[in-house]
């Protein structure tokens, strides 16, 4: 699906996020999906006239596994450089255990390096489209979006979704994450965008209306922060069910009780002992339709492509990654 003649929207299916292909003499791929979906990513690129070996640069909107999971394979197979906000670049390249929130979220990410740290106001020229880097914190501190003024297109990442809002993580992204998300929305709403591409959901045909809806929801969460906690927990747990192919009845409780995100939201977000939160979260997953029991397993009900067993080929936690080799910028 095209966003404009020079920016192609590559729709992702969970566990992958959407991607964008920005065409030109030096084509750019924005985000790379989940690691197990790399063959599909390569196929989408070829179908859109840009085989992966022709890419000049990968740009990550932020470092969660559904947006950076294909980095490792694309770097190893094609030697492609990666660009990301300088704060997240430093964490990735230093193999910081907090990088990608991989351990906190229990989400695997294979090793990659960031070759080009980005800052607010940087410009990327594909030879056909100029992309302006916007620092858009909220979902993560180092989140960026890309503005193509000549196209009137915003590439949002998870700053705003086509059919939802991004979950907020005050425990790893700071107590002011919600306020930063609101400031990001205010800033984005001032741009004359005619179309916006988000990390999840369909293209946004009325960006201003989407920003207004997201702002109202975040403002409500500021007044009722427990709603933000429930939203985040359902999103994170549903994603875990997707990437692990569901959980058996006797696996749900032990799994949740070993997850750092579950402990933080239970104790610090909702004032509950983690053991007290297992039942209510499971009940809400079932009530809301986020998950259901199928043949004795709790599975996510949103459309998704379960990763095949054995797809990981290397360490899946940044602290275990090998040191990055030298790469050209």
Regions found by a protein language model. Name each.
Residues 1-7, 102-106, 127-129:
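Short Pro/Gly-enriched beta-strand edge/turn motifs at strand-loop
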Residues 5, 55-56, 69, 74, ...:
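A structural signal for the main folded, soluble domain(s) of proteins
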Residues 37, 116, 176-180, 273, ...:
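Soluble or luminal CAZymes and related metallo-dependent hydrolases
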């Amino acid at each position: 699906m095209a966003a404009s003649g020079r920016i192609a929207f590559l729709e992702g299916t969970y566990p992958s996020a959407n991607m964008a292909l920005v065409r030109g003499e030096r084509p750019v791929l924005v985000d790379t999906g989940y690691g197990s979906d790399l063959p599909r990513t390569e196929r989408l690129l070829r179908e859109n006239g840009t085989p992966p070996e022709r890419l000049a640069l990968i740009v990550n909107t932020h470092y969660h596994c559904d947006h950076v999971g294909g980095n490792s394979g694309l770097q190893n197979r094609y030697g492609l450089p990666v660009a990301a906000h300088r704060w997240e670049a430093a964490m990735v390249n230093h193999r910081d255990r907090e990088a990608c929130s991989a351990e906190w979220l229990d989400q695997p990410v294979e090793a990659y390096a960031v070759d080009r740290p980005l800052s607010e106001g940087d410009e990327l020229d594909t030879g056909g489209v100029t992309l302006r880097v916007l620092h858009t914190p909220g979902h993560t501190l180092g989140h960026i979006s890309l503005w193509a003024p000549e196209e009137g297109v915003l590439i949002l990442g998870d700053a705003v979704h086509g059919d939802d809002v991004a979950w907020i993580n005050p425990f790893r992204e700071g107590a002011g994450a919600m306020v930063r998300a609101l400031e990001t929305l205010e800033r984005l709403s001032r741009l004359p965008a005619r179309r916006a591409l988000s990390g999840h959901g369909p293209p946004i045909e009325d960006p201003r209306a989407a920003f207004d809806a997201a702002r109202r929801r975040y403002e409500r969460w500021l007044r009722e922060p427990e709603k933000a906690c429930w939203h985040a927990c359902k999103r994170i747990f549903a994603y875990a069910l997707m990437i692990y192919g569901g959980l058996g009845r006797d696996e749900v409780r032990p799994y949740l009780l070993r997850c750092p995100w579950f402990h933080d939201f239970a104790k610090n977000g909702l004032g509950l002992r983690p053991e007290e939160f297992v039942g209510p979260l499971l009940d809400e997953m079932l009530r809301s339709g986020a998950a259901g029991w199928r043949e004795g397993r709790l599975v996510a009900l949103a459309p998704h492509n379960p990763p095949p067993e054995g797809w990981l080929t290397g360490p899946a936690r940044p602290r275990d990654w090998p040191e990055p080799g030298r790469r050209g910028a």
